[in-house]
Amino acid sequence: MDVHDVKLTISAVAAAQYPEDGHPEIAFLGRSNVGKSSLINKLIQRKAMARTSGVPGKTQTLNFYDLDSRLFFVDVPGYGYAKVSKTARAKFAAMIETYLTTRQPLRGVVLLVDSRHEPTADDISMYQYLKYYQLRTLVVATKIDKTPKSKRLHVAKQIKQRLDLNQTDDVILFSATTGEGYEAVWSWLEQTAGLEGR
């Protein structure tokens, strides 16, 4: 999909603030600093549309990015950051749960994991949560350019085993630096959002 116009439509903290356009939505989930904003920026070919930060836990709202009035990317607050207060973590969790379990236009979820490390207990819990609610999920292993090519198949296999990936879900190795995995991720997004050939 060639993206021409991108705008941050809404930064929401409650369901009443969600867009009412009815366009399909894809949510991006992952631990703090896993590379969500970098992935989104690469996919939409913008250097700084989604705000990247060296500070974990920076995203504290559901950020809805409108792509050509056809599709929303939803940047979800990162999980697993210990320095965020328990109160803030509980607030984030409730906000994310409400969105994932009640949002009609949501077509699928991109779950990001760091390819340099095994999926964490938080990653495993999140994947199990997504499967419990039968949400279509793509696992994207970020920062794959940091891993030697000879070890990448092993990385993908390790992620599949650790998450106990079901047969309908897949792992795509991705690098925001080199663009590896870009076309494969977009292919999944278009198919999942029902935008193939449109």
From Swiss-Prot:
NCBIfam families reported for this sequence: GTPase_YsxC (TIGR03598), small_GTP (TIGR00231)
Q: Which Gene3D superfamilies match?
A: P-loop containing nucleotide triphosphate hydrolases
Keyword Transferase on entry: no
Q: Which domain of life is it from?
A: Bacteria
Q: Which residues bind Mg(2+)?
A: S37, T59
* Organism expressing this protein natively: Lacticaseibacillus paracasei (strain ATCC 334 / BCRC 17002 / CCUG 31169 / CIP 107868 / KCTC 3260 / NRRL B-441) (Lactobacillus paracasei)
Which residues does the annotation say bind GTP? 30-37, 57-61, 75-78, 142-145, 174-176
Any idea what this protein is called? Probable GTP-binding protein EngB
GO molecular function per UniProt? GTP binding; metal ion binding
- Needs which cofactor? Mg(2+)
